[in-house]
C-alpha cells in the first residue's frame, strides 16, 4: 500500500506525515512531495522513527515520482488562511495548484483514491473532478473532499459540553466544508440531549472553529495539527477499506446522488474501490432542515465556481 502526501512540507503535510509514519499498516510505503526543497529532509527526519513504514521525500516542480504507484493520494498543497481571510480567499492560489496536481494524477496514477484537503474544499473537489473527467479517467468512487476536521471538532465540542469521553461520541456532519455549509447533525448524537440554545451555539462554534484557530494563532497559521489528525483518520480508514476491511464508514464530500447538490458531504461506506455506498444521513430536526435549506445556495455556488474554473 503506497500513500502519497502532496504538500508534505507544510503545516498540515508534516503533521499528517508524522501520524502516517506511526500508524500506517506494516509494510506500507509513504511518499512525501512538496515544491519546497526541505521535503527530502522531512522524510529523512521521519525515517528515523522506528516503524515498519518506508518513507521517501521528493522536492521540485514534478510530483511524478511520489505519485507513481500510489494507492492513496492526500493533497494538502496550497496557501493557508491568515486572519481576515475566509476559505474563499484561498481560491485564487489554491484552485490552480489543485488543477495542475489533478492533471498529473490523471496521467501517473489515475486509479488512486484521492483525498483533497486543500481549501476551499467545496470548490477544489469539483475542479479535480472536472480535470479527471476531461482526461477520461474520472471515477466518482475515488475522489473525496476530506471533511473529517468538522467531524472531530464536533466530537470534541460535544464531549466537552456534556462531560463525555470524546471517543464515545459520533457526530455525522453533512453539507460542505466551510461556514454555513458545515452542518453537524447533533440530533443524531446517541445518549446526549441538547437544548435549542446549545444546538445553535454548538453549530455556530463548529462552523467557525477554523476562524477560532486562525485568530488564536495571531497570523502564525491556520488549523494544521488538528487537520493533520483528521486527514490521518480519513486516510487510515480508506487504507483499511482498500485492504478489505468491512463496515468502514466516514463522512466525506463526494459526488453522490444527493438531491441537494452535485457534491455533498455525508456518511459514506468505504470499500475496495473507494466509495462502496453513499449512506443516507437519516432524519433531520427542524433546526437542521432549516440550516440545510439555508446553505444550498452557497454550496451550489461554490461548486459552480469550481466547474467554471476547470473548463
Swiss-Prot record:
UniProt KW Membrane keyword: no
One cellular-component annotation, GO: cytoplasm
The protein's Enzyme Commission number: 1.1.1.37
SUPFAM superfamilies referenced in this protein's UniProt entry, alphabetically: LDH C-terminal domain-like, NAD(P)-binding Rossmann-fold domains
Binding of substrate, residues: 81, 87, 119, 153
Disulfide bond sites: none
Known catalytic reactions: (S)-malate + NAD(+) = oxaloacetate + NADH + H(+)
GO molecular function: L-malate dehydrogenase (NAD+) activity
Active site: 177
Keyword vocabulary terms for this entry: NAD, Oxidoreductase, Tricarboxylic acid cycle
Record flagged with keyword NAD: yes
Gene3D superfamilies: Lactate dehydrogenase/glycoside hydrolase, family 4, C-terminal (3.90.110.10), NAD(P)-binding Rossmann-like Domain (3.40.50.720)
Example of a GO biological process term: malate metabolic process
Cross-referenced CDD domains: MDH_glyoxysomal_mitochondrial
Quaternary assembly: Homodimer.
HAMAP family, sorted: Malate_dehydrog_1
NCBIfam families: MDH_euk_gproteo
Functional summary from the UniProt entry: Catalyzes the reversible oxidation of malate to oxaloacetate.
Recorded family membership: Belongs to the LDH/MDH superfamily. MDH type 1 family.
Record's protein name: Malate dehydrogenase
Amino acid at each position: 500500500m503506497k500513500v502519497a502526501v502532496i504538500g508534505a512540507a507544510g503545516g498540515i503535510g508534516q503533521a499528517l506525515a508524522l501520524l502516517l509514519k506511526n500508524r500506517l499498516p506494516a509494510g506500507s510505503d509513504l511518499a512525501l512531495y512538496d515544491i519546497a526543497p526541505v521535503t527530502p529532509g522531512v522524510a529523512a527526519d521521519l525515517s528515523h522513527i522506528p516503524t515498519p513504514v518506508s518513507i521517501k521525500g521528493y522536492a521540485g516542480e514534478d510530483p511524478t515520482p511520489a505519485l507513481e504507484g500510489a494507492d492513496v493520494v492526500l493533497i494538502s498543497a496550497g496557501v493557508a488562511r491568515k486572519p481576515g481571510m475566509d476559505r474563499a480567499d484561498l481560491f485564487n492560489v489554491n484552485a490552480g495548484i489543485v488543477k495542475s496536481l489533478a492533471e498529473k494524477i490523471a496521467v501517473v496514477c489515475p486509479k488512486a483514491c484521492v483525498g483533497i484537503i486543500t481549501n476551499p474544499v467545496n470548490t477544489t473537489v469539483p475542479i479535480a473532478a472536472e480535470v479527471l473527467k476531461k482526461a477520461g479517467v474520472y471515477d466518482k468512487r475515488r475522489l473525496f473532499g476530506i471533511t473529517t476536521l468538522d467531524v472531530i471538532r464536533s466530537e470534541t465540542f460535544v464531549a466537552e459540553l456534556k462531560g463525555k469521553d470524546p471517543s464515545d461520541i459520533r457526530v455525522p456532519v453533512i453539507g460542505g466544508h466551510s461556514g454555513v455549509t458545515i452542518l453537524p447533525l447533533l440530533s443524531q448524537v446517541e445518549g446526549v440531549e441538547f437544548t435549542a440554545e446549545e444546538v445553535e451555539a454548538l453549530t455556530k462554534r463548529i462552523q467557525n472553529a477554523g476562524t477560532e484557530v486562525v485568530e488564536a494563532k495571531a497570523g502564525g497559521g491556520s488549523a494544521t495539527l488538528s487537520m493533520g489528525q483528521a486527514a490521518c483518520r480519513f486516510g487510515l480508514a480508506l487504507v483499511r477499506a482498500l485492504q478489505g476491511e468491512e463496515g468502514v464508514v466516514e463522512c466525506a464530500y463526494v459526488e453522490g446522488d444527493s438531491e441537494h447538490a452535485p457534491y455533498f458531504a455525508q456518511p459514506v461506506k468505504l470499500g475496495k474501490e473507494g466509495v462502496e455506498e453513499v449512506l443516507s444521513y437519516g432524519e433531520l430536526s427542524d433546526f437542521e432542515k432549516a440550516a440545510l435549506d439555508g446553505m444550498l445556495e452557497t454550496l451550489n455556488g461554490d461548486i459552480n465556481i469550481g466547474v467554471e474554473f476547470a473548463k
